[in-house]
């Protein structure tokens, strides 16, 4: 499996948008590898995991085309992992020449934030985007990957988050 980390930081990023600590000052000065954007990764150039507010930056930084992806796994509803408002720009009227539909996989909590993004737009585009609710411990298949969603506690909530075991038959990856 080829794993490409686009971002490995937390919600506040490094340097933090309002922070003046020693670490953030150092990151601002050195740039490059010292900068940490919000978490997002790609497996084998096929499977996209998480869609944070920094997705647009990742698109520019790594010369990506998110229109090429068919599948998106969302670990949880926090905006540093799922920023649905940007995902809505995949709809017709915003994006042209998209031949495929993106299926977004996540739990019920993520679905609420997904739906909110389209409620703000006043419409949905099911030809471009589809939401698939996934359940803890119930594996499913995307392309040649078997995905095992495992519940995790994150923040003050229980089971609002998934970690994923992703198995391609040769290798397994815990995300």
Question: What are these language model-derived features?
Answer:
Residues 1-4, 86-91, 117-121:
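N-terminal short leaders/motifs
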Residues 98-102, 108-133:
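Active-site neighborhood of divalent metal-dependent phosphoester bond hydrolases
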Residues 1-64, 132-175:
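Core dinuclear metal-dependent hydrolase active-site scaffold
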């Amino acid at each position: 499996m080829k794993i490409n980390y686009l971002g490995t930081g937390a919600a506040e990023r490094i340097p933090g948008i309002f922070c003046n600590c020693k670490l953030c000052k150092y990151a601002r000065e050195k740039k490059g590898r010292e900068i940490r954007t919000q978490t997002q990764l790609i497996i084998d150039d096929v499977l996209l995991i998480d869609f944070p507010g920094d997705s647009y930056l990742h698109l520019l930084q790594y010369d990506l085309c998110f229109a090429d992806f068919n599948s998106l796994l969302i670990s949880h509803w926090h905006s540093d992992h799922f920023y649905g408002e940007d995902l809505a720009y995949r709809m017709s009227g915003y994006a042209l020449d998209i031949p495929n539909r993106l299926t977004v996989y996540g739990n019920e909590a993520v679905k609420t934030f997904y739906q909110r993004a389209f409620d703000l737009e006043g419409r949905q585009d099911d030809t471009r985007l589809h939401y698939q609710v996934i359940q803890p411990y119930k594996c499913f298949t995307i392309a040649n990957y078997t995905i095992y969603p495992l519940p995790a506690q994150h923040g003050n909530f229980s089971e609002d988050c998934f970690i994923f075991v992703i198995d391609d038959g040769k290798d397994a990856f815990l995300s």
